[in-house]
């Protein structure tokens, strides 16, 4: 076993042990802090990771308990926030067989900037508009999310209706609200467009949505009928018991085939996942299992992702540690372009966050990827290509105001 991976596993085990032993303390986007007089830690375990109160605040359509919300002209401040990440990285790529170093990258960069407006547009009507640019990759300034939620169709947010471009994810395990700069390899979060019914009641949080499928224009555009895209649906639920959360989710959608012919217009892709968030004292443990089948339009081809993550609050509201291990395992189907020779890999990340103030943190992080290719997370890019071993050392700043 690689000594770095062994070290990460030891750190994760220690974090889990300490999390059981340390006393628990009960723990916002800056725009919400200004409007409601809240501290960031009222909604976040550590920015951007939500606590239980933050999850309920979001699912209520950005309303506090027993409040209906206001019109924009009644607000005491503009509901707008800016969020950004800057980083210095030193990355290396090695031959998976000889271990010889193939390349080295060393640079400072602005990774991403976001503008976000969120709050209530009227009593019981919440909204979120998020726009972002991946500056380091030269990406465009684009729309991440734009949705409205009509809350309290059944009282106390037992049932809400949300529509627009939004995220299909669990609130306790989110690509957008992770501590690490390194993204999750597992299919944790999907950006979808459509309508969703959601709510929470007596420790149960739930949602079901009908959304556009995952098909996109391909090489043979004429063979892809994108006039009937509203063919995806999903449902998820989670239950909180003794401060721990268990979640399940099912996704059924259409996706483009990886074969150029004869299947162009996509086949059904399905996903079933289960997650467990164990929250002890000042620590958390996240476990995830993700099963995809009929991936890439290939009948019966499946892929499994496994995720283990531990987080520890070493100094209250100041110093946090995070360690994560992920593995991707793809089944074999004769003639498929997605077989294990091109679709397996592992990812290990070790992370330290120090909060200078509640909305500004300094980050140090190490990530190692071992992959054989397709859909293995290349460092810095979700669902990219990792054709060899890669490792990255990173120093960064994450801020919101």
Predicted features by range, described:
Residues 101-103, 146-150, 154, 240-401:
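Outer-membrane beta-barrel pore domains
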Residues 51-52, 79-90, 102-216, 229-233, ...:
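Outer membrane beta-barrel
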Residues 1-11:
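Bacterial N-terminal signal peptides that target proteins for export
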Residues 16-25:
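C-terminal segment of classical bacterial N-terminal signal peptides
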Residues 37-47:
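The canonical Cys-X-X-Cys-His
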Residues 29-39:
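Sequence/structural segment immediately N-terminal to covalent heme-attachment motifs in c-type
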Residues 53-67:
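Short cysteine/histidine-rich metal-coordination sites, predominantly Zn2+-binding motifs
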Residues 66-85:
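Short Fe-S-cluster ligation motifs
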């Amino acid at each position: 076993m690689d000594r770095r991976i062994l070290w990460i596993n030891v750190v994760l085990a220690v974090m889990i042990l300490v999390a059981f032993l340390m006393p628990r303390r009960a723990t916002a986007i800056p725009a919400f802090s200004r409007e409601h007089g809240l501290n960031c830690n009222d909604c976040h375990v550590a920015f951007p990771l939500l606590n239980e109160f933050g999850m309920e605040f979001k699912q209520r359509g950005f309303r506090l308990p027993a409040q209906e919300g206001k019109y924009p002209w009644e607000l005491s401040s503009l509901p707008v926030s800016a969020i950004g990440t800057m980083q210095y990285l030193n990355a290396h790529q090695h031959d998976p067989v000889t271990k010889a170093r193939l390349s080295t990258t060393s640079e400072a960069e602005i990774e991403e900037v976001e503008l976000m407006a969120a709050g209530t547009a009227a009593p019981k009507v919440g909204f979120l508009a998020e726009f972002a640019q991946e500056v380091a990759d030269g990406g465009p300034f684009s729309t991440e999310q734009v949705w409205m939620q009509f809350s309290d169709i059944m009282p106390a947010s037992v049932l809400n209706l949300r529509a627009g471009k939004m995220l299909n994810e669990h609130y306790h395990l989110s690509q957008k609200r992770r501590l690490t700069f390194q993204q999750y390899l597992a299919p944790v979060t999907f950006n979808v467009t459509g309508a969703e019914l959601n709510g929470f009641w007596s420790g149960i949080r739930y949602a079901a949505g009908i959304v556009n499928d995952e098909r996109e224009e391909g090489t043979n555009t004429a063979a892809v009928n994108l006039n009937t895209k509203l063919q995806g649906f999903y449902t998820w639920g989670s239950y909180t018991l003794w401060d721990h959360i268990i979640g399940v989710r099912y996704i059924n959608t259409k996706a483009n085939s990886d074969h150029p012919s004869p299947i162009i217009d996509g086949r059904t892709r399905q996903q079933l996942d289960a997650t467990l968030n164990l929250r002890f004292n000042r620590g958390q443990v996240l476990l995830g299992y993700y099963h995809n089948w009929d991936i890439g339009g290939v009948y019966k081809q499946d892929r499994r992702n496994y995720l283990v993550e531990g987080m520890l609050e070493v100094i209250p509201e100041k110093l946090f540690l995070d360690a994560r291990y992920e593995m991707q395992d793809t089944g074999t189907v004769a003639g498929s372009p997605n077989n294990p020779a091109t679709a397996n890999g592992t990812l290990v990340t070790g992370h330290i966050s120090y909060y200078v103030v509640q909305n500004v943190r300094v980050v140090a992080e190490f990530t190692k990827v071992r992959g054989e290719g397709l859909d293995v997370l290349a460092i810095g890019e979700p669902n990219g290509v990792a054709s060899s071993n890669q490792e990255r050392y990173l120093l960064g700043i994450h801020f919101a105001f």
